[in-house]
Amino acid sequence: MVEAWYMDDSEEDQRRPHRLEPERPVSLAHLQQLGVFYWKLDADKYEDDPELEKIRKERKYCWMDIITICKDKLPNYEEKIKMFYEEHLHLDDEIRYILDGSGYFDVRDKEDKWIRIFMEKGDMITLPAGIYHRFTLDETNYVKAMRLFVGEPVWTAYNRPADHFEIRGQYLQFLAQKG
Protein backbone atom coordinates (compact mmCIF):
# COMPACT_ATOMS: atom_id res chain seq x y z
CA MET A 1 0.00 0.00 0.00
CA VAL A 2 1.20 3.50 -0.78
CA GLU A 3 2.86 5.50 1.98
CA ALA A 4 2.61 9.30 2.17
CA TRP A 5 3.53 11.95 4.74
CA TYR A 6 3.96 15.68 5.25
CA MET A 7 7.50 16.81 4.45
CA ASP A 8 9.94 18.78 6.54
CA ASP A 9 11.48 22.00 5.18
CA SER A 10 15.02 20.67 5.07
CA GLU A 11 17.24 21.61 2.13
CA GLU A 12 19.13 18.30 2.46
CA ASP A 13 19.39 15.81 -0.39
CA GLN A 14 16.01 15.70 -2.17
CA ARG A 15 16.30 11.89 -2.41
CA ARG A 16 15.96 11.47 1.36
CA PRO A 17 12.49 10.82 2.90
CA HIS A 18 12.14 14.27 4.55
CA ARG A 19 9.59 13.20 7.17
CA LEU A 20 8.35 15.75 9.69
CA GLU A 21 9.25 15.16 13.35
CA PRO A 22 6.93 14.04 14.79
CA GLU A 23 5.69 12.28 11.68
CA ARG A 24 2.43 13.31 10.03
CA PRO A 25 1.27 10.41 7.83
CA VAL A 26 -1.21 11.07 5.04
CA SER A 27 -3.96 8.57 4.23
CA LEU A 28 -5.09 7.42 0.81
CA ALA A 29 -8.45 9.09 1.56
CA HIS A 30 -6.65 12.41 2.14
CA LEU A 31 -4.82 12.04 -1.19
CA GLN A 32 -8.15 11.36 -2.92
CA GLN A 33 -9.47 14.63 -1.48
CA LEU A 34 -6.67 16.29 -3.46
CA GLY A 35 -7.68 14.42 -6.63
CA VAL A 36 -4.77 11.95 -6.41
CA PHE A 37 -5.74 8.36 -7.25
CA TYR A 38 -3.75 5.21 -6.55
CA TRP A 39 -3.78 1.55 -7.56
CA LYS A 40 -1.58 -1.40 -6.56
CA LEU A 41 -0.95 -3.68 -9.55
CA ASP A 42 1.29 -6.62 -10.43
CA ALA A 43 4.18 -4.97 -12.28
CA ASP A 44 5.60 -8.35 -13.30
CA LYS A 45 2.68 -8.89 -15.67
CA TYR A 46 2.07 -5.32 -16.91
CA GLU A 47 2.20 -6.41 -20.55
CA ASP A 48 -0.98 -8.48 -20.24
CA ASP A 49 -2.56 -7.47 -16.94
CA PRO A 50 -6.39 -7.46 -17.21
CA GLU A 51 -6.64 -5.09 -14.23
CA LEU A 52 -4.36 -2.54 -15.91
CA GLU A 53 -6.32 -2.92 -19.16
CA LYS A 54 -9.57 -2.32 -17.29
CA ILE A 55 -8.21 0.88 -15.69
CA ARG A 56 -6.84 2.08 -19.04
CA LYS A 57 -10.19 1.48 -20.74
CA GLU A 58 -12.29 3.07 -17.97
CA ARG A 59 -10.07 6.15 -17.74
CA LYS A 60 -9.31 6.34 -21.49
CA TYR A 61 -5.52 5.98 -21.08
CA CYS A 62 -4.87 5.12 -24.72
CA TRP A 63 -1.18 6.05 -25.07
CA MET A 64 1.79 4.82 -23.09
CA ASP A 65 5.55 4.55 -23.07
CA ILE A 66 8.20 3.39 -20.63
CA ILE A 67 10.95 5.57 -19.18
CA THR A 68 13.95 4.40 -17.18
CA ILE A 69 15.47 7.06 -14.96
CA CYS A 70 19.05 6.30 -13.96
CA LYS A 71 22.44 7.68 -14.94
CA ASP A 72 23.19 4.87 -17.40
CA LYS A 73 19.87 4.98 -19.28
CA LEU A 74 18.53 8.55 -19.37
CA PRO A 75 20.26 11.07 -21.66
CA ASN A 76 20.99 14.39 -19.92
CA TYR A 77 20.32 12.68 -16.58
CA GLU A 78 21.37 15.53 -14.23
CA GLU A 79 19.40 18.11 -16.23
CA LYS A 80 16.30 15.89 -16.29
CA ILE A 81 16.46 15.18 -12.54
CA LYS A 82 16.55 18.94 -11.85
CA MET A 83 13.67 19.50 -14.27
CA PHE A 84 11.50 16.76 -12.70
CA TYR A 85 12.09 18.25 -9.22
CA GLU A 86 11.13 21.80 -10.22
CA GLU A 87 7.63 22.55 -8.89
CA HIS A 88 5.21 22.56 -11.82
CA LEU A 89 1.78 21.66 -13.11
CA HIS A 90 0.42 20.12 -16.29
CA LEU A 91 -2.69 20.88 -18.31
CA ASP A 92 -3.49 17.14 -18.32
CA ASP A 93 -3.45 14.43 -15.66
CA GLU A 94 -0.07 12.85 -14.95
CA ILE A 95 -0.33 9.06 -14.78
CA ARG A 96 2.64 6.93 -13.73
CA TYR A 97 2.96 3.20 -13.07
CA ILE A 98 6.18 2.05 -11.36
CA LEU A 99 7.46 -1.12 -13.02
CA ASP A 100 10.72 -1.31 -11.07
CA GLY A 101 12.69 0.79 -8.61
CA SER A 102 11.25 3.61 -6.54
CA GLY A 103 10.93 7.36 -6.11
CA TYR A 104 8.83 10.15 -4.66
CA PHE A 105 6.03 12.31 -5.98
CA ASP A 106 5.54 15.48 -3.94
CA VAL A 107 2.16 17.23 -4.17
CA ARG A 108 0.83 20.42 -2.59
CA ASP A 109 -2.12 20.16 -0.21
CA LYS A 110 -4.92 22.73 0.23
CA GLU A 111 -2.69 24.84 2.52
CA ASP A 112 0.21 24.68 0.04
CA LYS A 113 2.25 22.28 2.19
CA TRP A 114 4.23 19.45 0.62
CA ILE A 115 3.05 15.86 0.90
CA ARG A 116 5.60 13.22 -0.14
CA ILE A 117 4.26 10.02 -1.75
CA PHE A 118 6.62 7.05 -1.83
CA MET A 119 6.18 5.05 -5.03
CA GLU A 120 7.64 1.60 -5.63
CA LYS A 121 7.18 -1.37 -7.95
CA GLY A 122 3.49 -2.02 -8.63
CA ASP A 123 2.27 1.44 -7.59
CA MET A 124 0.22 3.44 -10.10
CA ILE A 125 -0.81 7.03 -9.47
CA THR A 126 -2.81 9.73 -11.21
CA LEU A 127 -2.07 13.36 -10.35
CA PRO A 128 -4.85 15.69 -11.49
CA ALA A 129 -4.27 18.43 -14.05
CA GLY A 130 -3.58 21.72 -12.28
CA ILE A 131 -1.97 20.30 -9.11
CA TYR A 132 1.49 21.61 -8.25
CA HIS A 133 3.88 18.69 -7.92
CA ARG A 134 7.39 17.40 -8.55
CA PHE A 135 9.22 14.07 -8.78
CA THR A 136 12.54 12.79 -7.52
CA LEU A 137 14.30 9.50 -7.28
CA ASP A 138 14.98 8.13 -3.82
CA GLU A 139 18.44 7.03 -2.68
CA THR A 140 18.37 3.96 -4.96
CA ASN A 141 18.73 6.35 -7.94
CA TYR A 142 16.63 4.14 -10.21
CA VAL A 143 13.07 3.89 -11.41
CA LYS A 144 11.42 2.34 -14.46
CA ALA A 145 7.94 3.72 -15.05
CA MET A 146 5.11 3.50 -17.53
CA ARG A 147 3.76 6.91 -18.54
CA LEU A 148 0.11 6.86 -19.58
CA PHE A 149 -1.90 9.53 -21.37
CA VAL A 150 -5.43 10.28 -22.51
CA GLY A 151 -4.85 10.92 -26.21
CA GLU A 152 -1.57 12.17 -27.64
CA PRO A 153 1.12 12.75 -25.03
CA VAL A 154 1.78 16.31 -23.97
CA TRP A 155 5.12 16.74 -22.21
CA THR A 156 4.80 20.40 -21.27
CA ALA A 157 5.38 21.32 -17.63
CA TYR A 158 4.53 24.83 -16.43
CA ASN A 159 6.75 25.86 -13.55
CA ARG A 160 5.24 27.70 -10.61
CA PRO A 161 3.83 30.31 -10.69
CA ALA A 162 1.28 29.04 -13.22
CA ASP A 163 -1.93 30.17 -11.55
CA HIS A 164 -3.09 31.97 -14.70
CA PHE A 165 -3.94 28.71 -16.48
CA GLU A 166 -7.64 27.85 -16.59
CA ILE A 167 -6.88 24.29 -15.44
CA ARG A 168 -5.31 25.66 -12.24
CA GLY A 169 -8.51 27.60 -11.50
CA GLN A 170 -10.57 24.48 -12.17
CA TYR A 171 -8.37 22.49 -9.80
CA LEU A 172 -8.72 25.13 -7.06
CA GLN A 173 -12.52 25.02 -7.53
CA PHE A 174 -12.38 21.23 -7.14
CA LEU A 175 -10.45 21.65 -3.86
CA ALA A 176 -12.94 24.24 -2.59
CA GLN A 177 -15.84 21.86 -3.28
CA LYS A 178 -14.07 19.15 -1.27
CA GLY A 179 -14.26 21.46 1.75
Swiss-Prot record:
Q: Which ranges are annotated Acidic residues under compositional bias? A: 1-12
- Give membrane topology per the record: Peripheral membrane protein
Its cellular-component GO annotations read:
cytoplasm; nucleus; plasma membrane
Where do the segments described as Disordered lie? 1-21
| Keywords in alphabetical order | Amino-acid biosynthesis, Cell membrane, Cytoplasm, Dioxygenase, Iron, Membrane, Metal-binding, Methionine biosynthesis, Nickel, Nucleus, Oxidoreductase
- Where does this one sit in the cell? Cytoplasm; Nucleus; Cell membrane
Any Pfam family the entry gives:
ARD
Positions with a binding annotation for Ni(2+):
88, 90, 94, 133
Catalysed reaction(s)? 1,2-dihydroxy-5-(methylsulfanyl)pent-1-en-3-one + O2 = 4-methylsulfanyl-2-oxobutanoate + formate + 2 H(+); 1,2-dihydroxy-5-(methylsulfanyl)pent-1-en-3-one + O2 = 3-(methylsulfanyl)propanoate + CO + formate + 2 H(+)
User: Which first-to-last residue range defines the signal peptide?
Assistant: none
The family assignment reads:
Belongs to the acireductone dioxygenase (ARD) family.
HAMAP family, per the entry:
Salvage_MtnD_euk
Q: How does it assemble?
A: Monomer. Interacts with MMP14.
Name of the molecule in the record: Acireductone dioxygenase
